[in-house]
């Protein structure tokens, strides 16, 4: 099934015009298993097992014979971790810099296949999906940008929209993207803050919250990530209910996706502090999260993005500081995000398999 899911991801990446399933939890079409009992699954991420040197009934007969002669059964050690069991919190941190609109569309093209590839691996795919503010501002500009969720005949600066404090708080749930090339409306979310399995069409809803537009303030992706998982915005440890109340669950795997075409030189603190913030949000468990970063590659050789720039890309430093395998980084200048997210599916599944819920 895992291989089928990845093939579906690749197929959609190559054929963006193919419509994706829009029902929550829908996965790729199942393919019947071969009838032969001697076949084996060669996928490195398979959760199945194959008994070598005989059939299943032979193995049971052998075990029964050993039991009859007093031979103790083999000790396979303690059971493995339970894994995340499909319970995943997805945090999307998407820059709204002037040049980011095309890259947001690339994400929207691949998201259904990424979602379905993961959904097809679990009997119960229980997700929270949240996009967050990266600049702490709300900029509508012309009222003509205003969509169905607000009154285009209203007056600036809100064009008649009803706003709250969370709409202009960095790291807070983005439910009303505003400005040029954005959704420019209040997104229709079942719980008002992030996508859950109660949302009938997660793909349409994701398109709304992820189309954050371009031309806002200075994007601060790392600051937004740190704020998003802070006790203040989550409303934990003595804080009143926050903008991101209920998003981060103690027993769910956290998957953070950062997409920006800059180095994020403006966010506060060293990259080490960003790692500590994620780990603290998961109660000190450094194995409870996976980070996916798509950023400029001008700091590498070879590179796809413009001229070489030797300045330190702190987002690359951030990924390199994460525990082995917990960070994945790709180039924002790739024409197709499909291969990156295909690798991301494998990384998330590996992290999920090893996860021990708290």
What is each model feature region?
Residues 1-5, 32, 52, 133:
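N-terminal non-cleavable signal-anchor helices
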Residues 1-12, 225:
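Sec-dependent bacterial lipoprotein signal peptides
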Residues 1-2, 27, 172:
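Short, intrinsically disordered low-complexity segments
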Residues 11-82, 120:
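Ser/Thr-rich, Pro/Gly/Ala-heavy low-complexity intrinsically disordered linkers and tails
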Residues 71-358:
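Divalent cation-coordinating acidic motifs and surrounding scaffolds
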């Amino acid at each position: 099934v895992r291989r089928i899911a990845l093939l579906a991801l690749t197929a959609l990446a190559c054929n963006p015009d193919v419509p994706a399933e829009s029902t929550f939890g829908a996965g790729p079409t199942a393919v019947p298993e071969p009838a032969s009992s001697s076949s084996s699954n060669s996928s490195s991420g398979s959760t199945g097992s194959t008994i070598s040197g005989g059939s299943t009934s032979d193995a049971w007969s052998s075990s029964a014979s050993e039991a009859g002669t007093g031979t103790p059964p083999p000790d396979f050690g303690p059971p493995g971790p339970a894994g995340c069991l499909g319970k995943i919190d997805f945090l999307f941190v998407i820059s709204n810099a002037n040049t980011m609109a095309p890259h947001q569309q690339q994400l929207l093209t691949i998201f259904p296949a990424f979602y379905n590839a993961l959904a097809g691996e679990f009997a119960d795919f229980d997700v929270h999906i949240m996009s967050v503010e990266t600049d702490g501002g709300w900029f509508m500009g012309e009222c003509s940008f205003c969509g169905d969720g607000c009154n285009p005949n209203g007056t600036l600066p809100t064009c008649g929209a009803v706003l709250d404090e969370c709409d202009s708080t960095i790291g807070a749930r983005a439910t009303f993207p505003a400005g040029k090339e954005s959704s420019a409306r209040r997104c229709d979310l079942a719980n008002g803050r992030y996508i859950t399995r109660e949302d009938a069409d997660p793909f349409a809803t994701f398109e709304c919250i992820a189309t954050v537009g371009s031309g806002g303030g200075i994007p601060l992706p790392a600051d937004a990530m740190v704020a998003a998982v802070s006790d203040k915005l989550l409303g934990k440890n003595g804080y009143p209910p926050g903008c991101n109340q209920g998003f981060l669950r103690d027993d769910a795997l956290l998957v953070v996706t950062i997409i920006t075409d800059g180095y994020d030189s403006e966010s506060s603190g060293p990259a080490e502090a960003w790692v500590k913030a994620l780990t603290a949000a998961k109660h000190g468990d450094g194995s409870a999260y996976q980070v996916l970063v798509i950023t400029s590659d001008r700091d590498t050789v070879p590179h796809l993005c413009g001229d070489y720039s030797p300045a330190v890309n702190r987002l690359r430093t951030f990924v390199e500081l994460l525990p082995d395998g917990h960070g994945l980084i790709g180039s924002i200048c790739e024409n197709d995000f499909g291969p990156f997210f295909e690798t991301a599916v494998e990384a998330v599944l590996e992290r999920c398999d090893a996860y021990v819920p708290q």
